């Protein structure tokens, strides 16, 4: 069993056995009912990408390409415009979070990246001094929240650091999420930010190192308990999937495309499970 599958099953069991139920929940299912969840707090995982450990489960198929396209929309296009996500990338699942009448998700994610010129600053800092300890992406902007409606960012903070090991420079990343839907979004979010880590590493010709993942509220919605039990019953693959970025070292961050990524040795258990999302 891969490391990701071990962690996935452990987290499902912990939530189902030790979790508590939410109260006064904000999300709603499409039928209008309150989307309560069972949750635990303070979940943490560590993956050493340089040793082939990747945070993707084989217990069900994960749509990696659309997840990577979303990260390009946020950090390359730097926009909140849903038409860009749909027309350029063919991704539509953010439509449910459109701020009515705006064609956007509000002043969130890509809009905040652009507002603060975050990626240019991160790349400049790493170029001038790779060992600086100030490489922080923060999408938590109270001013923007006051000015615009919209879902507050779940994956809201990413930090980068470097290590030199045997003459090679490795880029590590830490992703912090305030909230995470364990069954639907957990591995999507993790692999998105691994892709971002790989893009920055390629920009400088570095190797990817470790990926640290902290989630404040890790939950399973109350209409997903049957799917959770099914995932626990499934027998995962013994082969570790790998995400590969097929561009030369030194490729500019903004020139990398979704098709440059390849998921190798990925043979997830089927059939796919269906989930009614909480909005």
UniProtKB/Swiss-Prot annotation:
NCBIfam families the UniProt entry points to: PRK01827.1-1 (NF002495)
Enzyme Commission (EC) number: 2.1.1.45
PROSITE patterns: THYMIDYLATE_SYNTHASE
UniProt subunit comment: Homodimer.
Pfam families on file: Thymidylat_synt
Pathway membership: Pyrimidine metabolism; dTTP biosynthesis
Keywords: Cytoplasm, Methyltransferase, Nucleotide biosynthesis, Transferase
One GO-annotated biological process of the protein: dTTP biosynthetic process
Similarity section: Belongs to the thymidylate synthase family. Bacterial-type ThyA subfamily.
Entry protein name: Thymidylate synthase
Positions annotated as active site in the UniProt record: 154
Binding site for dUMP: 133-134, 178-181, 189, 219-221
Major location category of this protein: cytoplasm
Residues annotated to bind (6R)-5,10-methylene-5,6,7,8-tetrahydrofolate: 181, 278
PANTHER family noted in UniProt: THYMIDYLATE SYNTHASE 1
Cellular component GO terms held in the UniProt record: cytosol
Subcellular location: Cytoplasm
Highest taxon of source: Bacteria
Single GO molecular function: thymidylate synthase activity
Lineage of the organism: Bacteria, Bacillati, Bacillota, Bacilli, Lactobacillales
Reactions performed catalytically: dUMP + (6R)-5,10-methylene-5,6,7,8-tetrahydrofolate = 7,8-dihydrofolate + dTMP
Function: Catalyzes the reductive methylation of 2'-deoxyuridine-5'-monophosphate (dUMP) to 2'-deoxythymidine-5'-monophosphate (dTMP) while utilizing 5,10-methylenetetrahydrofolate (mTHF) as the methyl donor and reductant in the reaction, yielding dihydrofolate (DHF) as a by-product. This enzymatic reaction provides an intracellular de novo source of dTMP, an essential precursor for DNA biosynthesis.
